[in-house]
Amino acid sequence: MTIMRKTHPLMKLVNHAFIDLPAPSNISGWWNFGSLLGMCLIIQITSGLFLAMHYTPDTLTAFSSVTHICRDVNYGWLIRYIHANGASLFFICLYLHIGRGIYYGSYSYMETWNIGIILLFLTMATAFMGYVLPWGQMSFWGATVITNLLSAIPYIGTDLVEWIWGGFSVDKATLNRFFAFHFILPFIIAAMAMVHLLFLHETGSNNPLGIPSDCDKIPFHPYYTTKDFLGIVLLLTFFLILVLFFPDLLGDPDNYSPANPLNTPPHIKPEWYFLFAYAILRSIPNKLGGVIALILSILILALLPHIQTASQRSLMFRPISQFLFWLLVSDVLILTWIGGQPVEPPFIIIGQIASLSYFTIILALMPIAGIIENKMLKW
């Protein structure tokens, strides 16, 4: 008798994606982040759904409704902190996943990589809109500052900003539409993640050596299901410690004050996971130039397959490129730190040097290193 998972139309899909999928025998723990991101998305959609049952997207009651969730709803405080810190967990996994892709040359699978970049943009948009919903001080001013950046677009900028706001300032209409978009986008992300997987399974997974692994494949289940489960248990342990012991560690104290359009916080900044891009934005004195640099800081990932010069795919045996990769990681961490600092010396110049280094490493130094390594290996 044929096994049902191999014949049933629906189970056949699951079987080909998660059970009988041929996977390279040597992929390391760095390949766990795909499943961890899936888990984060499920956590966020579930906790968000329960929060939406009690939240009211109205400027007069939004802040109070979040307070009500924390004080009066059974385990509301837990759901709220799971959702708030779940976003941080999502971005930690996302950045590690992208770092893995750069290190091991996974960007060679261009369709998968480009869908991944779209997923990153969608996730950033969702997180930004979610940050506005509690209607605290940083929610309001963050929304005002970031949406106002669109006014730098020539000719249509001002009209575009007023169209997004639904008026002449961030107000009830803005909050309402941000709630609607914040609710629908995670489902679009889930659909795009399916497309991401579809393209990945067309080519098969990359591996640490960066060489074809068709001659040595093993079934995904039980080997990698077990491995993924271990990763999920470890990550959930870390996550629950964060939620239950340090729930406000990654948040901003200003967001515990209700939004007040008449009182500007001394230092407006986004959540920690956007600080690197915010630092790049601030490092350019011109408004339009800053917006372009901000977009390019993410869009530059799409150039990686086109500026790859090395004959080897992975950085595993390329010491110069390895050094540059870790220099890039350090640079992003410095940018994250600078983004959280006030705009004053010496932070301004540090931010400008770090921003210039970010683009120089990716656009110039890494391709040059690839050529040098080819010469060293006589390829």
Curated annotation (Swiss-Prot):
<dbReference type="GO" id="GO:0006122">
    <property type="term" value="P:mitochondrial electron transport, ubiquinol to cytochrome c"/>
</dbReference>
<keyword id="KW-0813">Transport</keyword>
<dbReference type="GO" id="GO:0046872">
    <property type="term" value="F:metal ion binding"/>
</dbReference>
<feature type="binding site" description="axial binding residue">
    <location>
        <position position="182"/>
    </location>
    <ligand>
        <name>heme b b562</name>
    </ligand>
</feature>
<feature type="binding site" description="axial binding residue">
    <location>
        <position position="97"/>
    </location>
    <ligand>
        <name>heme b b566</name>
    </ligand>
</feature>
<keyword id="KW-0479">Metal-binding</keyword>
<feature type="transmembrane region" description="Helical">
    <location>
        <begin position="320"/>
        <end position="340"/>
    </location>
</feature>
<dbReference type="InterPro" id="IPR027387">
    <property type="entry name" value="Cytb/b6-like_sf"/>
</dbReference>
<dbReference type="InterPro" id="IPR005797">
    <property type="entry name" value="Cyt_b/b6_N"/>
</dbReference>
<feature type="transmembrane region" description="Helical">
    <location>
        <begin position="288"/>
        <end position="308"/>
    </location>
</feature>
<keyword id="KW-0496">Mitochondrion</keyword>
<feature type="transmembrane region" description="Helical">
    <location>
        <begin position="113"/>
        <end position="133"/>
    </location>
</feature>
<feature type="binding site" description="axial binding residue">
    <location>
        <position position="83"/>
    </location>
    <ligand>
        <name>heme b b562</name>
    </ligand>
</feature>
<keyword id="KW-0408">Iron</keyword>
<feature type="transmembrane region" description="Helical">
    <location>
        <begin position="347"/>
        <end position="367"/>
    </location>
</feature>
<comment type="similarity">
    <text>Belongs to the cytochrome b family.</text>
</comment>
<keyword id="KW-0999">Mitochondrion inner membrane</keyword>
<dbReference type="InterPro" id="IPR005798">
    <property type="entry name" value="Cyt_b/b6_C"/>
</dbReference>
<feature type="transmembrane region" description="Helical">
    <location>
        <begin position="226"/>
        <end position="246"/>
    </location>
</feature>
<keyword id="KW-0472">Membrane</keyword>
<dbReference type="InterPro" id="IPR016174">
    <property type="entry name" value="Di-haem_cyt_TM"/>
</dbReference>
<feature type="binding site">
    <location>
        <position position="201"/>
    </location>
    <ligand>
        <name>a ubiquinone</name>
    </ligand>
</feature>
<dbReference type="GO" id="GO:0005743">
    <property type="term" value="C:mitochondrial inner membrane"/>
</dbReference>
<keyword id="KW-0830">Ubiquinone</keyword>
<keyword id="KW-1133">Transmembrane helix</keyword>
<comment type="function">
    <text>Component of the ubiquinol-cytochrome c reductase complex (complex III or cytochrome b-c1 complex) that is part of the mitochondrial respiratory chain. The b-c1 complex mediates electron transfer from ubiquinol to cytochrome c. Contributes to the generation of a proton gradient across the mitochondrial membrane that is then used for ATP synthesis.</text>
</comment>
<keyword id="KW-0249">Electron transport</keyword>
<keyword id="KW-0679">Respiratory chain</keyword>
<keyword id="KW-0349">Heme</keyword>
<dbReference type="InterPro" id="IPR036150">
    <property type="entry name" value="Cyt_b/b6_C_sf"/>
</dbReference>
<dbReference type="Pfam" id="PF00033">
    <property type="entry name" value="Cytochrome_B"/>
</dbReference>
<keyword id="KW-0812">Transmembrane</keyword>
<feature type="transmembrane region" description="Helical">
    <location>
        <begin position="33"/>
        <end position="53"/>
    </location>
</feature>
<dbReference type="Pfam" id="PF00032">
    <property type="entry name" value="Cytochrom_B_C"/>
</dbReference>
<feature type="transmembrane region" description="Helical">
    <location>
        <begin position="178"/>
        <end position="198"/>
    </location>
</feature>
<protein>
    <recommendedName>
        <fullName>Cytochrome b</fullName>
    </recommendedName>
</protein>
<feature type="transmembrane region" description="Helical">
    <location>
        <begin position="77"/>
        <end position="98"/>
    </location>
</feature>
<feature type="binding site" description="axial binding residue">
    <location>
        <position position="196"/>
    </location>
    <ligand>
        <name>heme b b566</name>
    </ligand>
</feature>
<dbReference type="InterPro" id="IPR030689">
    <property type="entry name" value="Cytochrome_b"/>
</dbReference>
<dbReference type="GO" id="GO:0008121">
    <property type="term" value="F:ubiquinol-cytochrome-c reductase activity"/>
</dbReference>
<comment type="subunit">
    <text>The cytochrome bc1 complex contains 11 subunits: 3 respiratory subunits (MT-CYB, CYC1 and UQCRFS1), 2 core proteins (UQCRC1 and UQCRC2) and 6 low-molecular weight proteins (UQCRH/QCR6, UQCRB/QCR7, UQCRQ/QCR8, UQCR10/QCR9, UQCR11/QCR10 and a cleavage product of UQCRFS1). This cytochrome bc1 complex then forms a dimer.</text>
</comment>
<dbReference type="InterPro" id="IPR048259">
    <property type="entry name" value="Cytochrome_b_N_euk/bac"/>
</dbReference>
